[in-house]
Each structure stands twice: as structure tokens, then as C-alpha cells.
Regions:
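Short, internal active-site loops enriched in acidic
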Residues: 25-30, 146-150
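Glycoside hydrolase catalytic-domain groove-lining segments
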Residues: 1-23, 29-108, 124-134, 138
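Aromatic-rich peripheral "rim/lid" segments of glycoside hydrolase catalytic domains that contact
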Residues: 74-88, 92-97, 105-194
């Protein structure tokens, strides 16, 4: 209610067109998604106060150790959950923003980096498919954790578990922090240009 009043006052005073979003993490997980849908329905029951849904999308790999974390990465289940969540939020008549997309990866092996790249491309293709109709379902896509973090954080660090040390589109080959684009960067760019 307070955010709605502030929005209306700013619109009236400055003529700005402001949209209010509900933004939350793990919003593609089934149970949480369903609760959020009910919340948005309730908020918008009398008049449209919530204009959009912000999906913080930290995908894959929650566990206590790297081996289990890595086993939780690149799951087709996460892709289908994310797609279903976007469709459900969009069906409520609100814009959908992917506000923080981090496809987690905890290993710097050739195999893990290849799977990371392939999963990211599948995720971007899914966004393109969701937006292929006359009205886009996703109006913003922001990638979170652009760079790898292997030498700057330990496995007990929040950033390590949130993003994964090798989840970036760029990597530093040495301690000079000179960043190089990874194969995943070029694969995403190629998909977006097709």
C-alpha cells in the first residue's frame, strides 16, 4: 500500500510513468511460485497495483559441498520450472523480468564448462520461445555474476554459493584480473543473433 501511494504521488508530481514490481528469489520453484501468484492476484484484485514480477533466477546447485552442488546444476527440471513460472506470471497480466540470472557452475573442467554453455543456450532459447508470440512474456533479462570468481572467494563465501565460482561469461586467466570472454559468452551472443 505504501509503495502504491509513493508511485501515485511521484506520477502526479512529475508525470513519470512508474511500474511497481514484486521481485523475489527462487520464484521459479513450484511452491513459492504458487504463493507469489496468489499474492499478485490478491494485490491486483480491486485495481492493478502490481505491474510486474521480477524473477531472481539463481539456477541449480544448492548443497553443502561442491560435488553435490555441481550435481544440482544444469537440470532440465529447472528449465521446465522456469518456463512454467514465466507462463503463470504472464497469465496474471503482469510483465515478467528476469532480474538476476545466474546459471551456477562449480567446476572448471572442460566437461562442466561445456554443460554450462549448453544449458545457458537452452535457457536463452527458452526465453526467445516464450517471447515468440505477439506479446512478449519477458520484458527484461539481466545476467548476474558476469565474471568467474575462483580466486577471490572461498567456498564459505556467500557469492561463491550464490553464483558458483565458474558461472560467469568472462574469466580471469591470472591474478591481474584481465578478463577474457568464455565460450559461453559467444554461444549466448550467437543464439541471440540468430
Amino acid at each position: 500500500e505504501c509503495a502504491d501511494k509513493v508511485r501515485d504521488e511521484i506520477k502526479e508530481k512529475n508525470g513519470n510513468d512508474i511500474l511497481l514490481f514484486y521481485n523475489d528469489y527462487s520464484s521459479f520453484q513450484t511452491e513459492k511460485r504458487d504463493h507469489i501468484c496468489e499474492l499478485i492476484k490478491e494485490i491486483n484484485s480491486e485495481e492493478k497495483l502490481c505491474d510486474g514480477m521480477g524473477m531472481q533466477s539463481y539456477i541449480g546447485g544448492w548443497a553443502d559441498n561442491d560435488a553435490d552442488r555441481q550435481n544440482g546444476c544444469f537440470s532440465p527440471y529447472d528449465l521446465s520450472n522456469h518456463k512454467e513460472a514465466v507462463e503463470k506470471y504472464s497469465a496474471l497480466g503482469v510483465e515478467v523480468h528476469i532480474t538476476e540470472c545466474a546459471i551456477r557452475n562449480f567446476y572448471n573442467t572442460e566437461s562442466a564448462l561445456k554443460k554450462h554453455k549448453e544449458f545457458y543456450v537452452k535457457f536463452v532459447k527458452q526465453i526467445e520461445e516464450l517471447n515468440s508470440g505477439s506479446t512478449p512474456k519477458i520484458t527484461n533479462f539481466s545476467i548476474w555474476g558476469l565474471t568467474d570468481l575462483p580466486s577471490t572467494v572461498t567456498d564459505s563465501n556467500y557469492s561463491y554459493t550464490m553464483n558458483g565460482p565458474y558461472a560467469g561469461l568472462y574469466t580471469s586467466l591470472n591474478e591481474s584480473f584481465t578478463y577474457t570472454k568464455k565460450d559461453v559468452y559467444y554461444a549466448i551472443l550467437e543464439e541471440l543473433n540468430n
